[in-house]
């Protein structure tokens, strides 16, 4: 229901694109949260838009904010907070009072999706869940080299770099089974 309530959805994973193809639909292709976020940052820099940043560890968000100030001087930082907070209502009030044009939420899936669904109506901002993009932007994590991305195996590179993701990656074969079950049995 959270996903159905979203205003926009993107295929941030080759599995979604392949699953749609198996089911007879076509998607324009994979659109990563990181690529979307950096394109929006560039546009916000040119248009002097206000952004609120929420998520990641404190040292990550602090480093990222400094890099954004240096790289995108036209962006107005409406506010920011790390992803470790107990008083959700206080964060929501802070976001609301800062009147941002965009809210980038990096709390991880599915926490960020639930947070956005619950709170996005407190402001007219565009809210976007962007997973671990703050870590990449801050330099605490790296994206796969372009070759891996071009060959749709960025997930394999991430597994190689972060073997602790193995259990999470086990959801991928389960997803594929669900796609085929739906294709052949309609359930």
Regions found by a protein language model. Give the residues of each.
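Glycine-rich phosphate-binding "P-loop"
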Residues: 20-31, 73-86
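Short acidic/histidine-rich motifs immediately flanking catalytic phosphotransfer sites
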Residues: 12, 98-101
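A transmembrane-helix-recognition feature enriched in membrane-embedded lipid enzymes
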Residues: 15-22, 44, 143-187
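Hydrophobic alpha-helical segments within soluble ligand-binding/sensing domains
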Residues: 33-46
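Short, Asp-centered acidic motifs that coordinate Mg2+ and/or phosphate
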Residues: 8, 102, 126
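Internal alpha/beta domain cores that form substrate/cofactor-binding pockets in large enzymes
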Residues: 52-56, 64-65, 76-98, 107-136, ...
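N-terminal nucleotide/polyanion-binding subdomain common to many enzyme families
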Residues: 1-30, 34
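An alpha-beta-alpha
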Residues: 44-71, 171-185
